[in-house]
Amino acid sequence: GPQWVFGLRPFAFDGSGRVVAIARSRGRDRLLVIEAGIEPREIPIEATDLSYVSVVGSVAVVLAAGPTRPTAVVRADLATGVVERVREARSLGVDPAYLSVPRFVEFPTAGGRTAFAFHYPPTNPDVVAPPGDLPPLVVISHGGPTAHTNRRLDLEIQAFTSRGFAVVDVDYGGSTG
């Protein structure tokens, strides 16, 4: 995110010359350990969106989220790569069968550029659309110009998809996504 948004912590220093940073590519965040002269090393975290990195010694703590699980505090041991989900923000109480998992989409735009989006298909195990029917589509665009969309659990999107709507969340050009 942009540096003029207060409180963002996309990177932290570990005190021994390493930087632990969030890198975003193709709509997914990764946690990287960066050292001078060495290829960056990824700490694999089961999430699509990461934020607010803190490091003490060889332990990093980050907020991690995905499309079907609430945001959680995650602890990562930088030496061993062991990752532990410490606590989720809330209990969801929804059967995952009703949660739509987004698909990353790329499409061409003006000037030979590429734009990105997340497509959330309708998801409800109790309903089957008639053959040949296409669902109504809701298109969402984030507030910009330096914001981006994400794949964090969004109950508003899930409300649409569980009721038979498809949703496309566009990450338009010029944004940080």
What are these language model-derived features?
Residues 51-177:
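Serine-hydrolase catalytic core recognition
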